[in-house]
Regions:
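Intrinsic-disorder/low-complexity signal
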Residues: 1-252, 258, 262-264, 273-274, ...
């Protein structure tokens, strides 16, 4: 959202007063809304003109309000420009006809010659590729309306915006959360230095933050204590591990113990915290003693080893108090409603939603999550009732766990309750959630005087249940219609300096047939609908692998993977998607940068990541850490994902699902139509419109209407 190193699709730059960079971004040094260009020096115009010409050729426009001091200019000119200046034709072959014209043996010979020049020489010789002079294409002037803007912002305005996000009950990705916290911490530190922050205000503000991870980090920095026992445990865990999420697995507990052993300050701070708790505070904390007993035992064990007897005494007291004050962990009403059911009217459930919203226990994001669960289960039940899914057919459920991983649960349809009462209950839950979401969005549109949506016709957006449910700025499970274009390309771009030399893009269809470096390069030699661009094993200076989909009526259902064959965990690559309808496509090149409708940087956390699913001529955006395999291969989990798309995808709540209920207050228009409306009515401005086009889309576009 803010860090160019994370996502160039939605860049923001800021400069932290006298500090050039905070997590790789810049801002103007004042809080002025508009900079008086006539008072600026000649040097400013030279620097702006230089950056303008460079960035516009890459599809980016620089906000003139950015202050171009020496260090800011250097950062933009080197780090940022280097990040956006890339050649998407750094492919193995020069154009797609080079692949079609060769049989698999000829392609293999090219592969082997390439491997000999990279792995065979331990990367010490020159790399052989048939495309020894990649075509460099620039952004055409006709595409300037699709430019992405690198904006300027003051640290204060960003911090206020981020604090507003943290005060909403939405889960955030670790990277964006850290960016937000850096901004907020730096601003508050500046205010502290000027004695402008009241301690009581600070404690109240941090305690009211709804994002649990952010609350813990800020409390640690500013030495704030908590009343809630679960918050206390998160704080202790964070002090030892640096991670605010408690994971009581063998690996997680091992990291906790290592933190206590390696960091004497962590032991001292945790020990000091526990020994200074009053009797009443110990009784409150003992209510979660059994839930976190392993953690307390490890603290006691290590403190005993380091002769911290007072800490051991405090933990012994917790153990005694727990016999009286222990509170079993209970599943919340909303967390268990799908299994519990709801046999009353949807209006009664909606009333409870409103009540819990006021107390912070319910939100639009939770309503979306519950709606999706109820709707997906209802889809399965209805498919079974209609005879599409038989009694002994497999029924798959996907559960997301931390770090973008997922767990597949298999059961037979006969094990699923398909009674009329279940159908009624699921419908009641679904309708109540939808009504709540519609009312919430309607209120936002009315309050902000939004009258128009600019919505592309080639994408069907899902509504996100959290900030983690995005790929770049596109919500996960959104569907891009490939039938709108004759030519579709899914590709990955990377450089050695980003941490990996060899990424492998591939696709496996619903019959287990693979397209990729160790399989066929096409799905059909005579009339290929899918073509693989070739295997690049050295990104010096850069590399691209791509899958070209044409003749959309023949596109097979596939899952698209990217595997890290030779590289480091935490390295990155850039996922991009192009669409084009020209007749002479791909002559002398493979990728036209003017056709890129979407791109985002993705961190390679595991060896194998799933980038998307092609189902019924639609590309479904996903970002799932699939496995630790260096090479993609068919498995039962691929079968599960295809079945999930076949039977469950329609259950996801889409943005379009809400528009029928909002047509009386908002109108869907194109960019040109909206510009004409503005010309005809001087009271209509950009503030009366929400633009869902790819080039302007940010996570905030969705989050703002839902938070």
């Amino acid at each position: 959202m803010i860090n160019l190193n994370i996502n160039i699709n939605t860049p923001f730059l800021f400069h932290n007063y006298n500090t050039v960079k905070v997590n790789g971004v810049l801002t103007d040094t004042s809080d002025k809304d508009v900079m008086d260009l006539f008072e600026l020096s000649t040097e400013y115009f030279k620097r702006y003109a230089d950056l303008y010409l460079k960035f516009i050729a890459c599809g980016y426009l620089i906000d003139p309000r950015i202050v171009f001091d020496d260090e800011s200019y250097k950062f933009l000119n080197e780090e940022v420009y280097d990040n956006v200046n890339c050649n998407y034709n750094a492919t193995f072959y020069k154009d797609w006809s080079d692949i079609i014209s060769k049989d698999r043996f000829e392609l293999l010979i090219d592969q082997l010659l390439h491997y000999l020049s990279t792995y065979g020489t331990n990367y010490e010789g020159s790399t052989y590729i048939p495309n020894n002079c990649p075509e460099e294409m620039v952004i055409e002037p006709s595409k300037f309306k699709n430019l992405k803007v690198i904006k300027a912002s003051s640290l204060k305005s960003l911090s206020d915006k981020f604090l507003d996000i943290l005060n909403t009950p939405i889960a955030l990705s670790e990277q964006n959360l850290q960016c937000m916290l850096v901004c907020i911490k730096n601003l508050w530190m500046c205010y502290f230095a000027k004695n402008q922050i009241d301690n009581d205000w600070l404690k109240k503000t941090i305690n009211n933050i709804k994002n649990k991870e952010a609350k813990i980090v800020l409390a640690t920095v500013f030495n704030i204590t908590f009343d809630e026992p679960t918050d206390v445990m998160r704080l202790l865990w964070y002090i030892s591990t640096g991670n605010s999420q408690i994971i009581q697995s063998a690996k997680g507990l091992s990291e906790f113990v290592v933190g206590l052993d390696d960091n004497s300050m962590a032991r001292i701070v945790i020990g000091d915290y526990l020994t200074h708790l009053s009797t009443d505070e110990l009784k409150v904390l003992s209510s979660v003693y059994y839930r976190y007993k392993k953690i307390f035992m490890f603290i006691k064990n290590r403190c005993k080893y380091y002769n911290m007897e007072e800490v051991c005494t405090a933990i012994n007291k917790l153990s005694r108090y727990a016999k009286t004050y222990h509170k079993p962990m209970q599943v919340g009403f909303w967390e268990g409603i799908i299994n519990m059911g709801w046999d009353k009217q949807p209006t009664e459930l909606y009333t409870k939603m409103i009540e819990d919203t006021k107390s912070g226990k319910f939100s639009c994001f939770k309503a979306i999550k519950i709606y999706n669960s109820a709707s997906e289960k209802l889809e399965l039940v209805n498919q079974h009732k209609d005879g599409v899914i038989k009694e002994y057919d497999n029924c798959w459920s996907l559960y997301y766990i931390r770090n973008k991983k997922f767990y597949v649960k298999n059961m037979f349809m006969r094990d699923l309750d398909c009674s009329d009462n279940t159908i009624k209950s699921l419908n009641n839950i679904k309708y109540a959630c939808l009504y709540y979401i519609i009312k919430h969005i309607r209120q936002y549109l009315t309050d902000n005087k939004i009258k128009y949506f600019i919505l592309p016709d080639n994408i069907n957006y899902t509504l996100p249940a959290s900030e983690k449910n995005f790929i770049g700025s596109v919500p996960m499970w959104s569907q891009l219609d490939m039938s709108k274009s004759k030519h579709n390309i899914v590709g990955v771009y990377w450089r050695n300096e980003w941490g990996t030399k060899d990424f492998d893009l591939s696709a496996i269809d619903d019959e287990g047939v693979k397209i990729g470096w160790n399989a066929s390069y096409t799905n059909n030699p005579d009339k290929p609908a899918v073509i693989f661009s070739g295997d690049m094993t050295n990104a010096d200076p850069e590399a691209v692998e791509a899958l070209y989909y044409r003749n959309y009526e023949n596109i097979p259902n596939q899952i698209v993977f990217n595997n890290r064959f030779n590289g480091n965990q935490g390295s990155k690559f850039r996922l991009f998607f192009t669409q084009n309808n020209v007749d002479n496509f791909g002559r002398g090149y493979m990728v036209n940068p003017n056709d890129i409708i979407f791109s985002t940087d993705i961190i390679s956390d595991v060896e194998e990541q799933m980038l998307g699913i092609i189902n019924d001529n639609k590309f479904v955006f996903t970002s799932i850490n699939f496995s630790d395999n260096k090479v993609s291969e068919t498995s039962y989990r691929i079968e599960a994902l295809f079945d999930y798309c076949k039977y469950n995808m329609n259950g996801k709540l889409k943005l379009n699902d809400t528009l029928d209920y909002l047509s009386d207050i908002v109108r869907i228009v194109s960019v040109d139509e909206f510009n004409k409306i503005k010309e005809q009515d001087e009271n209509i401005t950009d503030d009366n419109m929400i633009n869902f086009s790819f080039n302007t889309l940010t996570k905030d576009t969705f989050i703002n209407i839902l938070k």
